[in-house]
Design a protein with these regions (language model features):
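Glycine- and other small-residue-rich loops at beta-strand/loop junctions that grip anionic moieties
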Residues: 5-6
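PLD/PLD-like phosphodiesterase catalytic module centered on the HKD motif
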Residues: 10-121
Length: 121
């Protein structure tokens, strides 16, 4: 599972990522470096749990919001939309999030994640 998200401050989402990692799911997380420096960011929680994490310092703003993961043995699925992984997005904002199970779309998202991951060694 790969996660590219601009802002990650929702403790429940961070906990779910950590639980997946603890179950042996191969997880990598990429966040925006400016947002990661926020006192509310959960980057340090993920780091402490051993989740591979990189902060994007190579683009103006890493404003992506997507997850690519296995869809219970049915191939890859992409979750994407306007939703940042924040409490405000979950509780206050008008946001959207969609699940895509088109394999060619999932491969494109995965390729973009790999490109950004490699840029931010």
């Amino acid at each position: 599972m790969v996660v590219a998200v601009y802002s990650l401050t929702h403790d429940g989402i961070s906990a779910a990522i950590i639980r997946a990692h603890d179950r042996g799911v191969k997880v990598r997380v990429l966040t925006d470096s400016l947002q990661a420096s926020s006192r509310y960011a959960d980057d340090e929680l993920l780091d402490a749990a051993g989740v591979p994490l990189r902060r994007d310092t190579q683009t103006g703003s890493m404003h992506n919001k997507f997850i690519v993961g296995d869809s219970k043995g049915k191939g890859l699925a992409v979750l994407t939309g306007s939703f940042n992984f924040t409490k405000s997005a979950a509780q206050k904002n008008a946001e959207n999030f969609i699940v895509l199970r088109l394999q060619y779309v999932a491969r494109e998202y995965l390729a973009e994640f790999e490109r950004l991951w490699a840029l931010n060694k």
